[in-house]
Amino acid sequence: KGKNFYDMLMVKDGNKEIIFAKDYIASLKVHRFAYDNIVRHLTEDNESSSTISPSLGLVESFDYLDGSKGTLKYKDQNNNYIVYDKASDIFKGKDARLYGTVVYPGTTFRGTPVEIQAGVAIWRDGHYELSVNPQLGSNYDDGGVWTGLDGPKDNTPDVSNTGFYIRKFVSEGAGASA
């Protein structure tokens, strides 16, 4: 359903719901929105991305389908961090428009998984310890992702510092970020 929301805004061919559309042709008229906001490791021939990093407030403004507020559930009733099996599990049950608006951990863009992860939770002595690595694209001892290619990372240009990328109005088409 989230993909349908994205397609409603981005796919013009055969879409009877398009109200305003403007075509851009590289040799005649261009814009830089996709260029400046594409997911970091999916840039084509540029070094720019993540000009707009959606905030947690925006993500949490999308309520859950059961009618509850959109606040992400990251701690249990005992104030312990919840460790999810998959990065996308924390977003389960959210309004599908979130997917059409924001690239968040555990999703894809252009059919490619995005790597948004800031560390790992390690089970030791009956509790989880959180471990981070400042190196983008790093792997933990077990071969899994430690810190994703796409961040988040503070104070680094062209990398999301919030853990989210904008999806809405960023074209998935080849050459859109060139």
Per-segment meaning from a language model:
Residues 1-148:
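An aromatic- and glycine-enriched ligand-binding surface/loop that stacks and positions planar moieties
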Residues 138, 144-178:
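Active-site beta-strand/loop architecture of penicillin-binding DD-peptidases
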